């Protein structure tokens, strides 16, 4: 018997990228399960979670993928990005080196992901105001220069987590609605079926994921 979470109009794959320790896993768990784990260790391999939201009267199911940021996981790059229509590029506002590495992550994203992918720059751990190492204005200017949307979040106290995911999913939905992307060869992810209007009956799960 299908659960309520299986009923949706669109399925969007969104990836979380950025250095290890910036809070990607906690952003994922805060948005999908409203949980935060102070003791969370670096993610090993890949995991994903889902959550459905309403965008302009349509049910959009987000399939959010998370992986560790360490170099040794580069081998999974192409599979990780395949079919992704959105990316949250995350850095830690209290660790400038994680912001410096945004450039490298952005290059990797543009090398491996679809050219039309929607990208949001996310300054996480905004609750660490007293330790801030990356000025908001600096990151905002960088985002504008690279045509990224931008937001600061705190997975710990929930600030802007909902807004970050809702904003990027809405932006993806509008791209679909405006025919910038679609479900055929012109679509994000090279027609992998990641963006799909749901038929009347629940689609097979395999249709929704990486082929």
Curated annotation (Swiss-Prot):
Disruption phenotype: Zygotic lethal. RNAi-mediated knockdown results in a reduced meiotic maturation rate of oocytes. Embryos are multinucleated and osmotically sensitive with permeable and therefore defective eggshells. During the first cell cycle, 52% of embryos fail to extrude polar bodies, 83% of embryos display no or minimal pseudocleavage and the centrosomal-nuclear complex does not migrate to the center of embryos. Residues 187-211 are annotated as: Disordered. It is found in: Cytoplasmic vesicle, Secretory vesicle; Endosome; Cytoplasm, Cytoskeleton, Spindle; Cytoplasm, Cytoskeleton, Microtubule organizing center, Spindle pole body. Pfam families: Ras. A motif (Effector region) lies at residues 40-48. GO terms for biological process: cortical granule exocytosis; eggshell formation; embryo development ending in birth or egg hatching; exocytosis; membrane addition at site of mitotic cytokinesis; mitotic cytokinesis; protein transport; receptor-mediated endocytosis. Expressed weakly in sperm, but more predominantly in oocytes. Expressed in the intestine. InterPro entries: P-loop_NTPase, Rab_GTPases_membrane_traffic, Small_GTP-bd, Small_GTPase. Its main location: cytoplasm. GTP binds at residues 18-26, 66-70, 124-127, 154-156. GO terms for molecular function: GTP binding; GTPase activity. It comes from the Eukaryota. Keywords: Cell membrane, Cytoplasm, Cytoplasmic vesicle, Cytoskeleton, Endosome, Golgi apparatus, GTP-binding, Lipoprotein, Membrane, Nucleotide-binding, Prenylation, Protein transport, Transport. A lipid is attached at residues 208-209 (S-geranylgeranyl cysteine). It is a lipid-anchor. GO terms for cellular component: apical plasma membrane; centrosome; cortical granule; cytosol; Golgi apparatus; Golgi membrane; Golgi trans cisterna membrane; recycling endosome. Interacts with rei-1 and rei-2. The GDP-form preferentially binds to rei-1 and rei-2. Belongs to the small GTPase superfamily. Rab family. This is Ras-related protein rab-11.1. It comes from Caenorhabditis elegans.
């Amino acid at each position: 018997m299908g659960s309520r979470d299986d009923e949706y109009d669109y399925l969007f794959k969104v990836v979380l990228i950025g250095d290890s320790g910036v809070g990607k896993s906690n952003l994922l768990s805060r948005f999908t399960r409203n949980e935060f784990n102070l003791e969370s260790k670096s993610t090993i391999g890949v995991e994903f979670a889902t959550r459905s939201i309403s965008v302009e009267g349509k049910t959009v199911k987000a399939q959010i993928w998370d992986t560790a940021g360490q170099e040794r996981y580069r081998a999974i790059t192409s599979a990780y990005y395949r079919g992704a229509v959105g990316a949250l590029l995350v850095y830690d506002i209290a660790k400038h080196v994680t912001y410096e590495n945004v450039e490298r992550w952005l290059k990797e994203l543009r090398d491996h992901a679809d050219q039309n992918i929607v990208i949001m720059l996310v300054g996480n751990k905004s609750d660490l105001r007293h330790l801030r190492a990356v000025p908001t204005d600096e990151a905002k200017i960088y985002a504008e220069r690279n045509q990224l949307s931008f937001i600061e979040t705190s997975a710990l106290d929930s600030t802007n987590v909902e807004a970050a995911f809702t904003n990027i999913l809405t932006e993806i939905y509008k791209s679909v609605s405006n025919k910038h992307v679609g479900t055929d060869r012109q679509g994000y992810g090279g027609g992998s079926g990641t963006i799909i209007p749901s038929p009347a009956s629940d689609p097979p799960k395999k249709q929704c994921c990486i082929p």
